[in-house]
Design a protein with these regions (language model features):
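Regulatory modules associated with amino-acid/nitrogen control
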Residues: 1-194
Length: 194
């Protein structure tokens, strides 16, 4: 059963097991909380749709547990963005359609094998923030069959400081070949010294 409620400063939607709650924090700034059994690529899909709508992701924490995702996004509506209280975040996350991986630039990164979640890659990175950075990164990783099981995204003073725990779709550690391909993609995204 679908349920929805909307006020001047908040909106709530429930669709099946998925739900979203949006709260206006300040002029143009919103907190979006989402939960549900979303597909592996949902973060890539949602971030792509948000970038297409001129919505900047300021910071995020998302985590997958027991087949359910829980996430909190702090979003900034840029000029020509829609009213973020009226966006159907569940529909966007479940749409199954994402833009293709665009180019992105990293200033630095570190990729480590981790035992977290039964075997993941932990990626930490720093980059100049830009609209679509997260979308491009996640889309590039999805092309390698890598998806985050947990991520922390933070933007400070125009800089992105991100940490992601990556696994294959359905969980499980990436293969040595996937790790090598991931290093190639990340090395190719490093900014070149002037």
């Amino acid at each position: 059963m679908d349920r929805a409620s909307l006020s001047d400063d908040a909106a709530f939607t429930r669709r099946g097991e998925a739900w979203s709650e949006v709260t206006r924090l300040a002029d143009g700034a919103f907190r979006v909380r989402l939960g549900g059994p979303f597909p592996a690529a949902w973060l890539s899909i949602l971030s792509s749709h948000l970038a297409e709508r001129n919505v900047s992701i300021d910071h995020t924490h998302a985590r997958h547990t027991e087949e359910i995702w829980i996430a909190e996004f702090h979003l900034i509506a840029l000029p020509s963005a829609p009213d973020l209280l009226s966006v159907d975040y569940i529909e966007l996350a479940e749409s199954g359609i994402a833009g293709s991986a665009g180019s992105f630039e990293l200033d630095s990164y570190r990729l480590l094998e981790s035992r977290d979640y039964g075997g993941t890659l932990m990626l930490t990175l720093e980059a100049r923030d830009s609209l679509g950075l997260l979308s491009s990164l996640l889309s590039s990783l999805a092309e390698l069959d890598l998806y985050p099981l947990e991520l922390h995204i933070e933007t400070r003073n125009g800089r992105a400081y991100d940490s992601l725990w990556l696994a294959r779709a359905g969980g499980g550690p990436p293969s040595p070949r996937t790790i090598a391909s991931t290093l190639d993609v990340l090395d190719g995204a490093l900014t070149k010294p002037s």
